[in-house]
A protein has these predicted regions:
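Active-site donor-binding acidic/aromatic loop of nucleotide-activated sugar
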Residues: 151-153, 320-329, 347
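A conserved nucleotide-sugar
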Residues: 122-124, 284-314, 319-320
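Short hydrophobic "strand-cap" motifs at the C-terminus of beta-strands
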Residues: 98, 269-270, 298, 325
Length: 368
C-alpha cells in the first residue's frame, strides 16, 4: 500500500499488492480493485503478472491479454539467436524438461515417474534445473531418472539456450510457465525447434515462441482455444501422476487435529490466495446447511487466520467451525486427508496436485 501511494504507476505493482491481499484473505475493497484492474488491462497497462491473475478473474480473454502485456514487457522474443527449424533426424528424440522444481515440490510429485518411464529406445531425456540443488529424496530420484541432468542455476538465458542447442534438443518442455523462479527468457531465445508449456502453469503464455500447451478437454474446452497463443495438444487427461507413491503409514485421530468426533468434515488444502469471497460465501452456505459440520483449511499465516475467522463470523457461522491446518511433511499431510469427508475446491483457480492427493487418499473432491 505504501509503495502504491508513492508510485502508483510502477509496472505490475498493483497486481503484486492484490496478490498479497489474496494471500492474507484481505477482501474489503476487492470488487473495486478488480474493476480498476480490468479497466487498466483493457487499456494495455502493465498492472499484474499472469500467475496472480489466475486466481482473480474467470475471464480467458482478460487472462490472455494479461499474459501478452506481461511477456511483451519482460520476455519479448529474442533475435540474438536465430530460430531453429529442426535438427537432422536423431536416432532418439531428445526431450529437455526445464524447471526450478526438481525437488520436493508439487510439480515433481506429479512428474517424477514421467522421466523414468520414457521408452529409452526412442527418447533421450534431459533435465535443465534452475532451482535449488536440495539433494533431497525427490531431487536425487529425478537426477537418477533422466539421462542427463544440467544444473543451469548460474547461467544466463542465452547460455542456457546455447547449452540446449549444443545437445540438439528436439523438444523443450517448460514445466513452470509464469510460476515462481520462471525463466521464460530461455524459451524466448528458442532452446529447441519445438517448445511446449506443460503442467506447472495452465494459462496461456501469450507469445508465439511456445508451440504447444498440453491440456485436456476439462482444462481447456475446444471452444476456448482462441484464448491461447499456443496450439493445444490434447491428452485424455493432462495430469501425469506417480504410481509408485505409497500411502502413508501415519494415522491421525480427529483429536490430534482438533476436529469434533461426530462432525462432517469439509476441507480445502489449496493455497490461501486461491480463496475468493465468492468461494468463501459458498463454503459458508454449505456449513449452514450441514448441522455440526466443520471446515478444515490449510493456512500458514496468523494474519490470514485472523482475517478468515472474521469473514466466517460475518457470514453468521461460529468461528469454531473453521479449523486451520498447518503445513506438514508430505506423509503427514497426506494422512490428514483421512480425517475429512469431502474436499471443497476453489474457483476460478482450481486444485491441481492437492486434488490428486485427496483422490489418492480416497477423499471425494467437489470442484467447479
Amino acid at each position: 500500500e505504501r509503495a502504491l501511494a508513492l508510485n502508483p504507476e510502477l509496472s505490475f505493482l498493483l497486481g503484486q499488492s492484490l496478490h498479497t491481499k489474496m494471500t492474507l484473505c484481505l477482501w474489503d475493497n476487492l470488487s473495486n480493485e478488480l474493476n480498476e484492474l480490468t479497466k487498466k488491462i483493457n487499456n494495455n497497462e502493465k498492472v499484474i503478472e499472469p500467475f496472480s491473475m489466475l486466481a482473480l478473474i474467470d475471464d480467458p480473454e482478460i487472462q490472455r491479454k494479461t499474459a501478452e502485456i506481461f511477456t511483451n514487457e519482460k520476455y519479448p522474443q529474442s533475435h540474438v539467436l536465430s530460430k531453429i527449424e529442426r535438427y537432422p533426424k536423431h536416432k532418439k528424440i531428445r526431450i529437455g524438461y526445464f524447471s526450478a522444481d526438481f525437488r520436493v515440490h508439487p510439480v515433481s510429485a506429479l512428474t517424477a515417474e514421467l522421466y523414468e518411464v520414457h521408452d529409452r529406445n526412442q527418447f533421450e531425456i534431459h533435465a535443465f534445473s534452475y532451482g535449488p540443488d536440495t539433494k533431497d529424496e525427490m531431487n536425487l530420484r529425478i537426477k537418477a531418472g533422466v539421462d542427463h541432468f544440467h544444473d543451469v542455476r548460474t547461467m544466463s538465458y542465452e547460455d542456457t539456450a546455447m547449452l540446449a542447442r549444443s545437445v540438439e534438443l528436439d523438444i523443450a518442455v517448460d514445466l513452470g510457465g509464469y510460476t515462481q523462479l520462471a525463466r521464460t527468457g530461455i524459451f524466448a531465445m528458442s532452446a529447441a525447434p519445438i517448445q511446449i508449456s506443460y503442467i506447472g502453469y495452465l494459462g496461456t503464455m501469450g507469445v508465439n515462441y511456445y508451440d504447444y500447451l498440453v491440456a485436456d478437454q476439462i482444462i481447456i474446452p475446444e471452444e476456448n482455444q482462441k484464448y491461447y497463443s499456443e496450439k493445444i495438444a490434447y491428452l485424455p487427461s493432462y495430469q501425469v501422476n506417480d504410481s509408485t507413491q505409497s500411502l502413508p503409514e501415519t494415522i491421525f485421530t480427529r483429536q490430534d487435529v482438533g476436529i469434533p468426533e461426530a462432525a462432517f468434515v469439509f476441507c480445502c488444502f489449496n493455497n490461501a490466495y486461491k480463496i475468493t469471497p465468492t468461494t468463501f460465501d459458498s463454503w459458508g452456505r454449505i456449513l449452514e446447511q450441514v448441522d455440526g459440520s466443520v471446515l478444515l483449511i490449510y493456512v500458514n499465516k496468523e494474519s490470514t487466520k485472523i482475517n478468515l475467522t472474521k469473514e466466517i463470523v460475518l457470514r453468521g457461522i461460529d468461528a469454531n467451525r473453521l479449523i486451520f491446518g498447518e503445513r506438514l511433511p508430505k506423509p503427514e499431510y497426506l494422512a490428514r486427508y483421512r480425517l475429512a469427508d469431502l474436499f471443497l475446491d476453489t474457483h476460478p483457480y482450481n486444485a491441481g496436485t492437492t486434488a490428486s492427493d485427496a483422490l489418492r487418499m480416497g477423499l471425494p473432491v467437489l470442484t467447479c
